[in-house]
Amino acid sequence: MSKYLLRRLLILIPVLAGISLILFTILAMAPGDPFEELATNPNVPAEVRMNLRAKFGIDDPIGVRYIRWFSSMMRGDWGFSFASRVNVDTLILQRLPTTLIVLGSAQLLAILVALPIGTMSAVRPYSIFDQIATTLAFIGFSLPTFFTGLLFILLFSVYLDWLPFIYRADISATGWRFYWEHLRQAIMPVAVLGLFQGAALTRFVRSAVLDVIRLDYINTARAKGLSEQVTIAKHAVRNALIPVVTLMALQIPTIFTGAVITEQIFRVPGIGSLLISAILANDTPVIMAITFVFSCVVVTLNLVADMLYGWLDPRISYR
């Protein structure tokens, strides 16, 4: 296990380097100028704009700019935001915890919804419960997150007035009231993301469990006298989770994409809203840093998924 993990970590180095090179090249070739706003300002002389471009190396060759950026990033210097006038790492560290909390809670909700419903649908295929669950699952992952987000706002914020529809970071409450207010305003973005992912995951859990419960070793476990609950939970579901874990790892980029949209709808001060603001302002250092952080998180979580295979199925050996 340790040798396999070390080998995978060493493989991540050229993978992340290649990802950073591709991202940097695409952003460098994309249209837009971070100093375009200064060009329309008559109070900023042309000499000042030229000096700024020379200082930040905007007109240097792409290869030179990439080497400079990558070496600076390895030293912990992620650049300077042209729009916010703040270091990029400071901006990301301010927003990243909020995004990770929302995404982690949404993924946990998706698992808590998908596992029991998908398993019960597989155990009782084509029953009334299975048909209702299948219908709701199809509706859940057919509706985009921006549409369900607007529906949630209309229902729970406008008509019922139960939940705030704008996420506020500057809550003045103290004590338990502070945590309660944060929980209330996080319910809708977490529910929108979690139910969307849970709907798709439910179908895959059902399919995976349905394939496993027809195998011979499940019939053998029943013949030994094990209860149906133990047979399904201990022997069927655990082995059926391997393709589900693979799917969850592959869906991580989709989750981040949904988070970008959801943060815009509910005004969540996370990485997604920061990325949209940086794109609109042509703030290349911030865009590059955020996309690279997303790539690192995706690659790391896929490595974690590979590690989970051995825990789910002890027959899998890491060499």
Regions found by a protein language model. Name each.
Residues 2-3, 96-129, 145, 158, ...:
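Alpha-helical transmembrane segments of integral membrane proteins
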Residues 6-16:
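N-terminal signal-anchor/signal peptide hydrophobic helix marking the start
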Residues 7, 40, 93, 134, ...:
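Phosphate-coordinating loops and pocket residues in cytosolic domains that bind phosphorylated ligands
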Residues 9, 52, 62-78, 88, ...:
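Hydrophobic alpha-helical segments of integral membrane proteins
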Residues 12, 42-43, 138, 154-155, ...:
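Residue-level recognition of pore/gate-forming positions within transmembrane alpha-helices
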Residues 15-67, 160-182:
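Hydrophobic alpha-helical transmembrane segments of membrane transport/permease proteins
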Residues 22-29, 71, 135-166, 192-198:
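Membrane-water interface segments at the C-terminal ends of transmembrane alpha-helices
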Residues 59-115:
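An internal, D/E-rich "acidic patch" concept
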